Amino acid sequence: MPRSVKKGPIVASHLLAKIEKQKNLKNKKVIQTWSRSSTITPIFVGHKIAVYNGREHIPVYITENMVGHKLGEFSPTRTYRGHNKKDKKIQKK
């Protein structure tokens, strides 16, 4: 179920503070965060945020299309390596 509109989006306060600091800077640094549940707001557009996926921080450049989504959606936690090509069940003749 989506969050109520009157409550507003969930955004980590420390993340907002870091973005406000870099708002007017020319050289924007990558902001590291562990807050995967934070909602992307229009303030985030143009920043690069490194989102933790359980192993490493994956840098994500925020665009206008991402507004309203969660940061964790752009940092996959599981790696898919494909199915075994030499599977004996498939090669039955």
Curated annotation (Swiss-Prot):
GO BP, one annotated term: ribosomal small subunit assembly
Annotated Basic residues bias: 80-93
Region (Disordered) residue spans: 73-93
InterPro entries membership: Ribosomal_uS19, Ribosomal_uS19_bac-type, Ribosomal_uS19_CS, Ribosomal_uS19_SF
RNA-binding in keyword set: yes
Keyword Transmembrane helix: no
Family under the similarity heading: Belongs to the universal ribosomal protein uS19 family.
Free-text function comment from the UniProt entry: Protein S19 forms a complex with S13 that binds strongly to the 16S ribosomal RNA.
Protein name, per record: Small ribosomal subunit protein uS19
Natural source organism: Aster yellows phytoplasma
The organism's taxonomic lineage, starting at the top: Bacteria, Bacillati, Mycoplasmatota, Mollicutes, Acholeplasmatales
